[in-house]
Swiss-Prot record:
Its EC number is 5.2.1.8. Consists of 3 domains; the N-terminus binds the ribosome, the middle domain has PPIase activity, while the C-terminus has intrinsic chaperone activity on its own. InterPro entries: PPIase_dom_sf, PPIase_FKBP_dom, Trig_fac, Trigger_fac_C, Trigger_fac_C_sf, Trigger_fac_ribosome-bd_bac, Trigger_fac_ribosome-bd_sf, Trigger_fact/SurA_dom_sf. This is Trigger factor. Residues 162-247 form the PPIase FKBP-type domain.
């Protein structure tokens, strides 16, 4: 009966596994004897408890341990015999109709990995963005850096987008004040999103000394649930308007950004180099997105339910941990919330694994090192970042996964037609 394979619906399989009782009991007795030499039991010195007492207290646990290990071993042997690729973990159940008292018989239920069929990709097209970086792109980036280091100076004019406004406010709902609805000397920059958009727009055009009343409806998803969808009336009194002052792009500015000799041209060259690196990453991301969608469309496979459920649970735990880290009140999420995402991830994972294996696309050491060095270039101490990656097997696994994805994208690009599409930097970054 050992290893009798039953093909069930879809990817489900069942194996009958038998365990000789005499072998099981022999191993149980051997372990109990070893345990008796060191176990501490009430009323006996360490290692002096009689075997019968040790068996009464620990026999059930030891027997379960031995049975579990034996089932795992014999299941592995049967899997090798039938050349099966197991997805997830088997579920063992005792068979009530065991034919011989000399044997314990179990059925192992499990799923196998599916066959992955991928249609030809030669009729498909991938659009590859092509970006020509110019002086204007460098200038825009420098302006962003200037704004990050801006100061503010009092302005004797009406408030506009980008100005810092200092004001007092009082809000009411149905004529009654509410928590957080009153403030003095509150300061906010118009357009930064610290306030609701309608509140910010109400400040535009006001000068120091001006007062204004206006109504505002809180959005349905507002964090303070008691205010969601409600209309409040606000009275504001502007105390000061300050206009932004950008630092000049000079030697002092360059030094503040890490250019030791303050050479502005070196700063511009460094900015352009960073932009080129970002363009490369974004282009690769765009190609990857298209390649993955194409593979999902062109592939046919059954999904092992066990893998989907494992991924659903993993996503649930990750989301709960992320919520807790951001101070969101702890709550138990349903794994069913992640069904679609989990199915997509499992499907893609199986497709990619098939392509990597069938086309020998394993990541090479030099490719992994190149990816690590590319990641490290974004930091002030790249050599330390490289060491940080190599010191962690988990981080190295992440980089290897990135390398495999790159290899699959390159393989898809070779199979399909790649069309270069002229794209501005802002379009690539989603800012156009």
């Amino acid at each position: 009966m050992q290893g009798n394979l039953e093909v069930l619906e879809g990817l489900a399989r069942r194996l009958d596994i038998s365990v000789p009782v005499d072998q099981l009991e022999t191993e149980v007795q051997s372990r109990l004897k070893r345990l008796a030499r060191s176990v501490k039991m009430h009323g006996f010195r360490p290692g002096k408890a009689p075997l019968s007492a040790v068996a009464r207290q620990h026999g059930a646990g030891v027997r379960q341990e031995v049975l579990g290990e034996t089932l795992k071993t014999r299941f592995g042997e049967a899997v090798q015999t039938h050349q099966l690729r197991i997805a997830g973990y088997p579920r063992f159940e005792p068979k009530a109709d065991a034919s011989a008292a000399a044997e314990m018989t179990f059925s192992a239920s499990f799923e196998v990995y599916p066959e992955v069929k991928i249609d030809a990709l030669d009729s498909a097209t991938l659009n590859r963005p092509v970006v020509e970086l110019g002086d204007a792109d460098v200038a825009k980036t420098l302006e962003v850096l200037q704004k990050q280091r801006r100061t503010f100076a009092t302005a004797a004019r009406a408030a506009a987008e980008g100005d810092l406004v200092k004001f007092d406010y009082q809000g009411t709902v149905d004529g009654a004040p509410f928590e957080g609805g009153r403030g003095e000397d509150f300061a906010a920059v118009i357009g930064e999103g610290r306030l609701l958009k309608d509140f910010e727009q109400a400040l535009v055009g006001l000068k120091a000394g001006d007062s204004k009343g206006f109504d505002l409806t809180f959005p349905a998803e507002y964090a303070a649930r008691e205010l969601a969808d409600k209309t409040a009336h606000f009275e504001v009194q502007v105390k000061e308007v300050q206009a932004p002052v950008l630092p000049p792009v000079d030697a002092e500015f360059a030094e503040a950004l890490g250019v030791e000799d303050g050479d502005v041209e070196k700063l511009k060259a460094e900015v352009k180099s960073n932009l080129e690196r970002e363009v490369k990453r974004r282009v690769q991301a765009k190609l990857k997105e298209q390649a993955m969608e194409l593979l999902l469309q062109k592939s046919t496979l059954d999904l092992p339910r066990s893998l989907v459920e494992m991924e659903m649970d993993r996503l649930r735990r990750m989301t709960e941990a992320d919520m807790q880290s951001r101070g969101v009140q702890s709550m138990k999420l349903s794994a069913d919330m992640f069904t679609g995402q989990a199915e997509r991830r499992v499907r893609l994972g199986l497709i990619l694994a098939e392509i990597v294996q069938a086309n020998k696309l394993a990541a090479q050491p030099e490719q992994i090192r190149s990816l690590i060095q590319d990641q490290a270039q974004s930091y002030e101490e790249p050599d330390q970042v490289v060491q940080w990656y190599y010191q962690s097997p988990e981080r190295m696994q992440e980089i290897e996964s990135l390398a495999l994805e790159e290899n699959v994208v390159a393989w898809v690009a070779d199979q399909a037609t790649v069309v270069d599409v002229a794209t501005s930097f802002d379009e690539l970054m989603g800012r156009a």
